[in-house]
Regions:
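Ligand/cofactor pocket segment of small-molecule handling proteins
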Residues: 3-18
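Active-site beta-loop-alpha junctions enriched in small/polar residues
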Residues: 12, 44-48, 149
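Bilobed periplasmic-binding protein-like "clamshell/Venus-flytrap" ligand-binding domains
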Residues: 70, 119, 142-148
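Structural preference for beta-strand elements that scaffold enzyme active sites
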Residues: 6-8, 38-44, 142-145
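An alpha-helical appendage that flanks or caps ligand/catalytic pockets
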Residues: 18, 23-135
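Structural motif
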Residues: 2-3, 139-140
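C-terminal helical cap(s) of enzyme catalytic domains, especially alpha/beta-barrels
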Residues: 18-28, 151-163
Length: 163
């Protein structure tokens, strides 16, 4: 609260995480004096837009996996769980570590459940993506920074939100 007038929340987080993180930020801002209502809130939102829901999830699953590899677990997953990310389950972490140990990043990607991808990204059909981005807005995000999972999705994502 005493350093800036806004925040950019990181990628691969759910709207529920966003609510929790913004509560922590608001409490801190109120302690240190700035008016939280004047804060700008941006968030990087991983998106995958396809006509087929499963295809969309598979296209962005790698991004979720990068946050759950053995090196990143303590730096990324741990803090997210402490803030209240409901889609990362402590009991799954040994399974992810084992999948990575046995199959590298490809093994880990295959081990990431759909629930993780659906929970921490805005992915699916165009209607699903639009609805999910609205959930981030409802959680307090004023500036959604949409990041497509694949280059071929960029124009479609731009067109979807240009309407």
């Amino acid at each position: 609260g005493e350093i800036g007038d806004g925040v950019i929340l990181n990628a691969v987080c759910s709207p529920e995480y966003t609510v929790n993180a913004l509560k922590i930020i608001k409490d801190s801002a109120e302690k240190d004096g700035p008016d939280f209502s004047k804060f700008f809130v941006a968030q990087i939102i991983n998106c995958s837009i396809e006509d087929d829901h499963k295809k969309a999830l598979d296209a962005v699953r790698w991004e979720v996996a990068t946050k759950l590899d053995p090196v990143q677990i303590s730096f990324i997953a741990g803090p997210k769980m402490r803030v209240g990310e409901p889609y990362i389950h402590k009991e799954d972490i040994p399974l992810f570590e084992k999948a990575h140990a046995e199959g590298g990043m490809e093994g880990l990607i295959k081990a990431i459940p759909d629930s993780y991808v659906e929970g921490m990204t805005a992915s699916g059909t165009p209607d699903e993506v639009k609805k999910r981005v609205q959930q981030y807005r409802d959680a307090g995000v004023q500036i959604p920074l949409l990041r497509p999972a694949a280059a071929h999705q960029t124009q479609r994502l731009l067109d979807l939100f240009a309407q």
